[in-house]
Amino acid sequence: IDLSKPLWTDIKGATDQFMLGDKHYVSVIRTDPAYVFVYNKQTMEDNGYDDPAELFKEGKWNWDTFTEMCLDFTDAESDKYALDGWYYEKALQQSSGVPLIGITDGKLVNNISDPMIAKAQNMMYELQKNNVVYPKHENNWKLRGDAEGIGMATGLTLFYPIGLWALENAPSTTVNYGDVSKGEVMFVPVPC
């Protein structure tokens, strides 16, 4: 593939991420965010929170704002947990902007001691310590209701980190997140 041709211009940067030495090993054809934080706008409003999409537009959607919402929302006695799903750890780790293992000048680099990775890990530790994550370990390692998104439409879950693929289906399969036709379901980039 000649990456200098116009067909490949938009994806050259992404394709270059898969180089080792001077060789490409993957040709990227499309990029999508691996994770977004899905939320229910009605739940945000009912709890008096600013809309995360608006916070993002204003440059105020970050780890601190996200953490404050999670800590405030969570009430285990009422079965309210800020986070549910399988992907929040990966999403937050990747939002540090530093891969655990990277490539610099064509060589593998271990970034485990990078300060941004430590910051992301400490944030996740604090979230877990404060029980903001639905306790799958107490529920036979199943999601709430044993299905993705359960708890969003009922106001029991604040954020559901997942790929956009979860919302790209028919309304009958996205009902767990809320009523799409009423504009209840929204997503925001993973905070950083």
Go through the PLM ranges and name each one.
Residues M44, T65-D72, L143-Y160:
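Short helices/loops that flank or line small-molecule/ion binding pockets
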Residues T67-C70, D105-K142:
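Glycine-centered hinge/linker elements that transmit conformational signals in sensory
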Residues I1-D10, D46-N47, G151, L158-F159, ...:
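Extracytoplasmic "Venus flytrap"/periplasmic binding protein-like
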Residues Q42-F56:
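Aromatic-glycine-rich donor-binding/catalytic loop that engages nucleotide-sugar donors
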Residues I117-K129, A147-A166, A170:
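Glycine-rich, aromatic-lined ligand/substrate-binding cores of catalytic
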Residues F18-F37, E45, N62-N110, M116:
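Extracytoplasmic/periplasmic solute-binding protein
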Residues Y177-C192:
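Extracytoplasmic/periplasmic substrate-recognition and gating elements
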Residues D2-D10, E54-E58, V98-K119, C192:
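Short, solvent-exposed loop/beta-turn-alpha elements that line the ligand-binding surface or hinge
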